[in-house]
């Protein structure tokens, strides 16, 4: 400011710099200040700092004041400052800032409101430098809580760490606290750093600076069906006054408290639901707790309803709640004693087994182990199972009746080779080697008896390796294997040409059947031919007593084909190609079947080793194996066919020409006949034309008269025909009506006759019934009784009249008939019933 005269209002101030001494001083208004030449006004008049009520400000580098409150000046006249320090000033008279003093502006506010601490709130403060308060020395680092409600008076030596709100503790809740340092809490309990405890007092709780709120713990509501399982973190005494060891587990139930709040050194393991059992339920508890509260590990306890209980710690129910075993009439339980056991039936040693048969209810005991719940196995007439006696090791088959395993019996599984299993599941017990399934898995129940349906006209050989004897079953039949029996598997040749082991089969087809084979032969002139042969065969066996030699040749197809091929090759080798080609069937038949005494070919070929008979052989094809020979043969055949075809064409052409010549001769002759007929027809036409001209000359009147006469004749004939048709129709209608009337009358007559017969039969039956009724009544009442009843009325009336002294009287005329039957009734006045 350059003005020499400065007007300073009230509560305003300026700083004047003395340029000679370099000292700055403060001048407060109201005053008019005349600036000297060596003085400089540093700024325009500024308002003094005004702190309203409930406010404060922070002055940095405050000036030093003496005990009287006056500003202390240095020797140079400069205001003495506490550099680096700060001073908090509250409400009062406005004051100027001396040179060097500064207002601490926080959030652009130099004057701030005093902080109000509401209820249930506190300020966590920390001493940043030592100071003395109410004769008490507060050292740096000390922390404390300023609780509300109040206004917080700040100090430069104290810093606010945070605002802390109280935690409200509701019913069934508690506050978990942890000590930060060693201290004595509000209840006078000494706490060490890291210790945890619960505050259960209801209401708002404001923690001290030595405490940390860990969490607010909700209580667990307990009921008759709900308990709380706890575990001790360390050894302590719980809220119920019981000493707990570290790691110990226990349960709190409704008997202890309706609500439980997990303590600081307790851990909630789980909420345990009560186990409720009805009269038909039970549980097996493992590791039960004894009366002292300790688990008996390795033991079990059976509890049966009706009851409700909680599982104690370490107790388990691996199988859960189980229904009481209801053993039916056709059921049983296989039991085994795990230790010495006494029941109503006697004493059982450990390891002994016995059966409990139904009907009954059974609950396993601790000393007994339930091995199996057995039922009667219903078996049809063609079903069975294998049963093994565990005592003797004997295996037997049970077939066709319901069976219950005994205590020393088990189902025995009969294992068969995988190849036989696959054959059993094939439709006819046969399968080709190329069709086998490498991943085949048998679905047969091993303990079920092995069954196989032998087809019609087939046989199966079964070998008992215990008795070393085979047996043969002829079809149709159902084979059931005994425990020590096995199937005889046939491995047959197949394909064309035959390949060994191409097919496996459980049954031997007895035939008649046929087989085909391809063989290569060579004639005497070294012509190689491929023959395709087919032959019929069957097994000649005695069905009443089949022989075991039928199965003596495992591959009878292969042996038969080899034998036939050998004979055919030998026979063909003795013939040249032309001779064999002309007589192939005869040569092969004689070679295979042979000849009898008279030189004729036999009818069959018999293999005595297995009673195998070949009845017929057929050559399906014969062709050279050499390609050139085959082509030459085909060319010769084609040439022969062409020659035959050409000769047939020439004969047909000659016959056709002969027929054409004959047809031409017939045609010429017919033309001449037609000309003669035409001339005759022309002659007749000329004659008719002449007659026509004569008729025309006779005049038109004759023609018209003839036409009218013919028309009249036609009309009369038409009317006559119509009259005949009407008469015929009337006659047909009358006959139909008459026939209809006759049929109706016949039906009515038949109906009337049947109705009369029914009425007569009904009347006869009613009369017979009435007569029978009367007869039975008479028989029931008796003859003497009827006579007495008939006489009782008249006798009584006579006696009555006699007692009155009347002899009787009657007045009548000759025209009125007299009925004296009821005269007595009329006289005595008795009503007629």
UniProtKB/Swiss-Prot annotation:
Asked if the record carries the keyword Phosphoprotein, the reply is yes
For this protein, the record's Pfam families field holds: MVP_shoulder, Vault, Vault_2, Vault_3, Vault_4
Q: Name one GO cellular component term.
A: nucleus
What keywords does the record list, in alphabetical order?
A: Cytoplasm, Nucleus, Phosphoprotein, Repeat, Ribonucleoprotein
The keyword Ribonucleoprotein is annotated on this UniProt entry: yes
Matching entries from PROSITE patterns are given as:
MVP (PS51224)
| MVP repeat start and end residues | 10-52, 54-115, 119-170, 171-223, 224-278, 280-328, 329-380, 381-433
* Localization of this protein: Cytoplasm; Nucleus
Q: What top-level branch of life does the organism fall under? A: Eukaryota
Question: Which purpose does this protein serve, as stated in its record?
Answer: Required for normal vault structure. Vaults are multi-subunit structures that may act as scaffolds for proteins involved in signal transduction. Vaults may also play a role in nucleo-cytoplasmic transport.
Assembly behavior? The vault ribonucleoprotein particle is a huge (400 A x 670 A) cage structure of 12.9 MDa. It consists of a dimer of half-vaults, with each half-vault comprising 39 identical major vault protein (MVP) chains, PARP4 and one or more vault RNAs (vRNAs).
Name of this chain's protein: Major vault protein
Q: Which organism is it from?
A: Leishmania braziliensis
């Amino acid at each position: 400011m350059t003005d020499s005269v400065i007007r300073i209002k009230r509560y305003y101030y300026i700083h004047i710099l003395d340029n000679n001494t370099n000292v700055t001083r403060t001048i407060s208004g109201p005053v008019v200040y005349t600036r000297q030449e060596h003085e400089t006004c540093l700024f325009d008049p500024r308002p003094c700092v005004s702190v309203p009520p409930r406010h404060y400000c922070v002055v940095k580098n405050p000036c030093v004041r003496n005990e009287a409150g006056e500003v202390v000046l240095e020797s140079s006249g400069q205001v003495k400052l506490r550099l680096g320090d700060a001073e908090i000033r509250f409400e009062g008279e406005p004051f100027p800032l001396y040179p060097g003093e500064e207002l601490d502006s926080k959030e652009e506010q130099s004057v701030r409101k005093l902080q109000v601490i509401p209820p249930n709130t506190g300020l966590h403060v920390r001493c940043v430098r030592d100071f003395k308060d109410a004769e008490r020395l507060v050292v740096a680092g000390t922390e404390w809580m300023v609780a509300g409600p109040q206004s917080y008076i700040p100090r430069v030596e104290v810093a606010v760490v945070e605002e802390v709100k109280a935690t409200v503790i509701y019913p069934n809740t508690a506050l978990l606290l942890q000590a930060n340092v060693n201290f004595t809490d509000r209840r006078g309990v000494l706490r060490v750093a890291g210790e945890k405890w619960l505050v259960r007092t209801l209401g708002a709780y404001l923690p001290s600076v030595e405490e940390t709120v860990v969490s607010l713990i909700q209580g667990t509501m307990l009921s008759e069906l709900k308990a709380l399982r706890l575990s001790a973190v360390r050894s302590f005494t719980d809220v119920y006054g019981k000493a707990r060891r570290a790691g110990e587990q226990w349960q709190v139930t409704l008997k202890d408290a309706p609500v439980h709040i997990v303590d600081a050194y307790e851990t909630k393991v789980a909420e345990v639901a009560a186990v409720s059992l009805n009269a038909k339920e039970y549980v097996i508890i493992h590791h039960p707790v004894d009366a002292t509260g300790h688990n008996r590990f390795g033991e079990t306890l059976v509890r049966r309803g009706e009851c409700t209980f909680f599982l104690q710690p370490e107790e388990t129910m691996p199988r859960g709640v189980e229904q009481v075993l209801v053993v039916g009439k056709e059921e049983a339980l296989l039991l085994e004693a795990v230790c010495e056991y006494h029941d109503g039936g006697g004493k059982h040693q450990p390891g002994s087994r016995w059966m409990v048969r139904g009907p009954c209810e059974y609950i396993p005991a601790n000393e007994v182990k339930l091995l199996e719940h057995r039922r009667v196995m219903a078996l049809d007439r063609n079903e069975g199972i294998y049963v093994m006696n565990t005592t003797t090791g004997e295996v037997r088959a049970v077939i066709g009746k319901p069976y219950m395993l005994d205590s020393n019996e088990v189902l025995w599984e009969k294992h068969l080779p995988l190849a036989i299993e696959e054959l059993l599941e094939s439709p006819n017990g046969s399968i080709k080697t190329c069709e086998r399934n490498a991943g085949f898995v048998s679905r047969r129940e091993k303990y079920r008896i092995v069954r196989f349906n032998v087809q019609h006209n087939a046989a199966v050989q079964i070998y008992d390796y215990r008795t070393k004897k085979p047996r043969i079953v002829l079809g149709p039949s159902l084979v059931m294997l005994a425990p020590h029996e096995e199937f005889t598997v046939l491995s047959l040749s197949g394909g064309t040409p035959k390949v060994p082991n191409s097919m496996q089969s459980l049954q031997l087809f007895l035939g008649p059947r046929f087989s085909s084979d391809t063989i290569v032969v060579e004639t005497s002139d070294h012509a190689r031919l491929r023959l395709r042969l087919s032959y019929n065969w069957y097994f000649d066996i005695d069905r009443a007593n089949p022989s075991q030699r039928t199965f003596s040749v495992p591959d009878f197809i292969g042996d038969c084909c080899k034998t036939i091929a050998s004979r055919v090759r030998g026979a063909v080798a003795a013939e040249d190609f032309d001779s064999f080609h002309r007589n192939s069937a005869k040569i092969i038949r004689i070679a295979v079947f042979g000849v009898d005494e008279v030189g004729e070919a036999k009818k069959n070929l018999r293999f005595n080793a297995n009673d195998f008979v070949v009845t017929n052989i057929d050559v399906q094809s014969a062709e050279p194996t050499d390609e050139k020979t085959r082509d030459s043969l085909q060319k010769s055949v084609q040439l022969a066919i062409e020659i035959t075809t050409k000769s047939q064409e020439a004969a047909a052409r000659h016959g056709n020409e002969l027929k054409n010549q004959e047809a031409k001769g017939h045609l010429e002759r017919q033309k001449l006949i037609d000309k003669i007929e035409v001339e005759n027809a022309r002659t007749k036409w000329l004659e008719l034309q002449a007659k026509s001209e004569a008729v025309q000359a006779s005049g038109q009147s004759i023609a018209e008269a003839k036409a009218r006469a013919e028309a009249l004749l036609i009309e009369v004939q038409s009317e006559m025909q119509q009259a005949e048709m009407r008469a015929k129709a009337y006659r047909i209608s009358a006959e139909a009506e008459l026939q209809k009337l006759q049929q109706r009358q016949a039906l009515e007559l038949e109906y009337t006759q049947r109705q009369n017969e029914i009425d007569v039969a009904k009347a006869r039956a009613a009369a017979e019934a009435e007569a029978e009724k009367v007869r039975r009544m008479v028989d029931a009442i008796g003859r003497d009784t009827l006579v007495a009843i008939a006489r009782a009325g008249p006798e009584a009336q006579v006696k009555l009249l006699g007692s009155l002294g009347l002899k009787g009287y009657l007045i009548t005329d000759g025209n009125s008939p007299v009925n004296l039957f009821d005269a007595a009734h009329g006289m005595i006045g008795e009503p007629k019933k």
